[in-house]
């Protein structure tokens, strides 16, 4: 469960390393974001000489959470870290590579992210 002030790792090669959630997109007063939700975040740590800079406000989609995700068939998926992929206004990823496993629940809304992922669980 991602809420405002939560720090997340960046799971792509866009140039940012760490994000902090500011807001959850989708409802006026939603408290938590889960896998597949879009958040507004600020870059807390960035790689030098990249297009993204520290303290820049961006949008990202949550791809991994420590809080378990329960599927309809009873399977439970839990990751070791909270991670997000930076996206533009159209929902396309800014990076060209995705690091780590991605949940199958992203397939409907974010097909481009799933196609770049090395492993889909």
UniProtKB/Swiss-Prot annotation:
Keywords: Chloroplast, Plastid, Ribonucleoprotein, Ribosomal protein, RNA-binding, rRNA-binding. GO terms for cellular component: chloroplast; cytosolic large ribosomal subunit. The keyword Chloroplast applies. It is found in: Plastid, Chloroplast. PROSITE patterns: RIBOSOMAL_L14. Belongs to the universal ribosomal protein uL14 family. This is Large ribosomal subunit protein uL14c.
């Amino acid at each position: 469960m991602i809420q405002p002030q939560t720090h997340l790792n960046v799971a792509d090669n866009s140039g940012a390393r760490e994000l902090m959630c500011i807001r959850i997109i989708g409802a006026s007063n939603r408290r938590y974001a889960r896998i597949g939700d879009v958040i507004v975040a600020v870059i807390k740590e960035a790689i030098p000489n990249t297009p993204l800079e520290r303290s820049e406000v961006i949008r990202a989609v949550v791809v991994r959470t420590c809080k378990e995700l329960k599927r309809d068939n009873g399977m439970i998926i839990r990751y070791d870290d909270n991670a997000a992929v930076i996206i533009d206004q159209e929902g396309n990823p800014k990076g060209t590579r995705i690091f780590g496993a991605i949940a199958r629940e992203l397939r409907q809304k974010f097909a481009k992210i799933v196609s770049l992922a090395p492993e889909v669980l």
